[in-house]
């Protein structure tokens, strides 16, 4: 057994630390408590939306598990930026920034106070990768716990998610539904606290937590309102001390094989493209070489086996009813697509856990398919390259009916300009909407584009109009959408050189994103291009723009691990 009071003695043992003990005795510590491991409980709590509304309650259950296992739990908060509420507003510039801030705040709090281990509770999109980045950065025993998905809504026999509300706005603007129809969907689409209900970014990252081995097997799918969510909170508290006893730290878990498994799972479920950014960032923090080239190679081997929204009709709660994420992982493992020797925080390899796990005796009911008879015969996401994205771009082919598209560019230097064009009917079938200067440095913050992509789909243009951007997409995005174009426009990437009327080729099968111009013309335009002035001269956004790397590097702000 490994000594599990690995850091706290420096803070709390000995005569010279008597004042430190006084501080904790003031909040109820006993003398005996100082002989136990001190375990941080990170609650990403906020009332600024439903996603993290309940995490303080979950923290209490985590502390119960820690106490049962012989430790003392101390809760601490971090910030939350609710992506859905900020969509299409200046607030979205703070979304991706918050991921790195969350990792930084966790490092500051838990390193400053010498905790021996910790459990991180995440909910909304960026809290989860931020916590996972901090786990490998601190590299002390840690377990990730997801706050859980919201329940789906219902409109008669129609299952609703927040995706329906975003798309209903586009349908209303196009005259396809009435204002009363829109209001009914608005009222019914999000009936409980928890995260967005499809396999959007939050549920994707929760699934990734299981695939990486950072969270307990089966813990991703129970809804936020489920009693099993509280049971997993208690179990996570126990598990972190077991991991500490076994000497298991996150960098022993987040290896190349674990990242490989996460990528396979992402592609097999057509999960959020944001997960590629986040996995690149997690690998960066772990000091593991895992690049877009790895994603590209893996994507060529994996079909889509899950019919989860937005690629299919089902919500996360439907997956939960038939066994949750382990049912997906076991299919992939039995097909030889997962690397079973990857270690997990539970102290066993993922292969051993999956060998032991048995699905409930329920039919898959169209939610899941077999690898040899997939839902779609190709990967959910493809990496694109070409003269428009020399360093790469991503396309969620699993949520598009067409993998190939050619059209003429309509260029906008902000999402707001492009949204006005959609709302006014300026965008027509055959157009390729190009939205630029929305990348990591240019926006800054690489905002998501759900407001405009949902408007395009809602207007009935989802399969006849394409969109290309150096920004990001929500996990709820569907249609012919290409994002993360790198290099971005603000640093002189080729997307900055596109002009109205230029012909663009998108080929999701071949992995191609091409501007049909000769190199001489591109060079002429490049000589005439000059970078725009920074949008912010002070504050957090200016600091971020000065530090952030490009999307193909995970849009990270911290130096590499040596």
Swiss-Prot record:
Belongs to the IlvD/Edd family. GO terms for molecular function: 2 iron, 2 sulfur cluster binding; dihydroxy-acid dehydratase activity; magnesium ion binding. The modification N6-carboxylysine is found at residue 126. InterPro entries: DHAD_IlvD/Edd, Dihydro-acid_dehy_C, DihydroxyA_deHydtase, DiOHA_6PGluconate_deHydtase_CS, ILV_EDD_C, ILV_EDD_N, IlvD/EDD_N. The active site is at residue 474. It comes from Pyrobaculum aerophilum (strain ATCC 51768 / DSM 7523 / JCM 9630 / CIP 104966 / NBRC 100827 / IM2). Its cofactor is [2Fe-2S] cluster; Mg(2+). Functions in the biosynthesis of branched-chain amino acids. Catalyzes the dehydration of (2R,3R)-2,3-dihydroxy-3-methylpentanoate (2,3-dihydroxy-3-methylvalerate) into 2-oxo-3-methylpentanoate (2-oxo-3-methylvalerate) and of (2R)-2,3-dihydroxy-3-methylbutanoate (2,3-dihydroxyisovalerate) into 2-oxo-3-methylbutanoate (2-oxoisovalerate), the penultimate precursor to L-isoleucine and L-valine, respectively. It is an enzyme of class 4 (lyase). Gene3D superfamilies: IlvD/EDD C-terminal domain-like. It comes from the Archaea. HAMAP family: IlvD. The keyword Transferase does not apply. The keyword Oxidoreductase does not apply. It holds the Pfam family ILV_EDD_C. Binds 1 [2Fe-2S] cluster per subunit. This cluster acts as a Lewis acid cofactor. Pathway: Amino-acid biosynthesis; L-isoleucine biosynthesis; L-isoleucine from 2-oxobutanoate: step 3/4; Amino-acid biosynthesis; L-valine biosynthesis; L-valine from pyruvate: step 3/4. Mg(2+) binds at residues 83, 125-126, 448. GO terms for biological process: branched-chain amino acid biosynthetic process; isoleucine biosynthetic process; L-valine biosynthetic process. PROSITE patterns: ILVD_EDD_1, ILVD_EDD_2. Homodimer. It catalyses: (2R)-2,3-dihydroxy-3-methylbutanoate = 3-methyl-2-oxobutanoate + H2O; (2R,3R)-2,3-dihydroxy-3-methylpentanoate = (S)-3-methyl-2-oxopentanoate + H2O. This is Dihydroxy-acid dehydratase. [2Fe-2S] cluster binds at residues 51, 124, 196.
């Amino acid at each position: 057994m490994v000594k599990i009071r690995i850091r706290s003695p420096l803070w709390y043992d000995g005569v010279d630390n008597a004042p430190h003990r006084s501080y904790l005795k003031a909040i109820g510590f006993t003398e005996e408590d100082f002989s136990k491991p001190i375990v941080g409980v990170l609650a990403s709590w906020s009332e600024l939306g439903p996603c993290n509304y309940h995490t303080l309650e979950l923290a209490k259950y985590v502390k119960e598990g820690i106490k049962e296992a012989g430790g003392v739990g101390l809760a601490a908060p971090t910030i939350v930026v609710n992506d859905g509420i900020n969509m299409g507003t200046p607030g979205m510039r703070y979304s991706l920034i918050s991921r790195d801030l969350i990792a930084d705040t966790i490092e500051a709090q838990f390193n400053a106070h010498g905790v021996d281990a910790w459990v991180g509770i995440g909910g909304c999109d960026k809290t989860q990768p931020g916590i996972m980045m901090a786990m490998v950065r601190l590299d002390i025993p840690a377990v990730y716990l997801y706050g859980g998905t919201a329940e789906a809504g219902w409109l008669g026999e129609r299952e609703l998610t927040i995706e329906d509300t975003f798309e209903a706005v586009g349908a209303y603007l196009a005259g396809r539904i009435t204002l009363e129809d829109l209001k009914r969907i608005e009222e019914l689409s999000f009936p409980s606290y928890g995260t967005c209900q499809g396999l959007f970014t939050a549920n994707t990252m929760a699934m990734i937590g299981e695939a990486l081995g950072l969270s307990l097997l089966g813990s991703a799918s129970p809804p936020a309102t489920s009693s099993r969510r509280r049971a997993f909170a208690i179990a996570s508290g126990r598990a972190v001390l077991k991991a500490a006893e076994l000497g298991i730290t996150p960098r022993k878990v987040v290896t190349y094989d674990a990242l490989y498994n996460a990528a396979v799972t992402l592609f097999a479920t057509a999960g959020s493209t944001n997960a590629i950014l986040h996995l690149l960032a997690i690998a960066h923090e772990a000091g593991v070489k895992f690049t877009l080239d790895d994603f590209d190679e893996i994507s060529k081997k994996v079909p889509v086996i899950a019919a989860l929204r937005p690629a299919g009709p089902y919500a996360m709660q439907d997956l939960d009813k038939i066994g949750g994420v382990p049912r997906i992982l076991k299919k992939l493992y039995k097909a030889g697509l997962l690397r079973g020797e990857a270690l997990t925080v539970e102290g066993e390899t993922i292969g051993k856990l999956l060998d032991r796990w048995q699905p409930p005796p329920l039919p898959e009911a169209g939610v899941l398919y077999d690898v040899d008879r997939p839902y779609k015969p190709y990967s959910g996401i493809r990496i694109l390259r070409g003269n428009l994205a020399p360093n790469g771009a991503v396309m969620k082919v699993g949520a598009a009916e067409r993998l190939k598209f050619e059209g003429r560019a309509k260029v906008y230097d902000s999402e707001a300009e492009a949204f006005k064009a959609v709302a006014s009917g300026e965008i027509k079938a055959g157009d390729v909407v190009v939205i630029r200067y929305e990348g990591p440095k240019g926006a800054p913050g690489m905002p998501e584009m759900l407001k405009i992509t949902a408007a395009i789909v809602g207007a009935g243009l989802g399969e006849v109009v394409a969109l290309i951007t150096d920004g990001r997409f929500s996990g709820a995005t569907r249609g012919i959408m290409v994002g993360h174009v790198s290099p971005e426009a603000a640093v002189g990437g080729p997307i900055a050189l596109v002009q109205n009327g230029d012909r663009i080729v998108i080929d999701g099968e071949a992995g191609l994103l091409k501007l049909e111009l000769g190199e001489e013309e591109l060079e002429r335009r490049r000589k005439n291009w000059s970078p725009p002035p920074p949008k912010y001269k002070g504050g957090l956004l200016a600091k971020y723009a000065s530090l952030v790397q490009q999307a193909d590097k995970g849009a990270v702000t911290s130096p590499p691990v040596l």
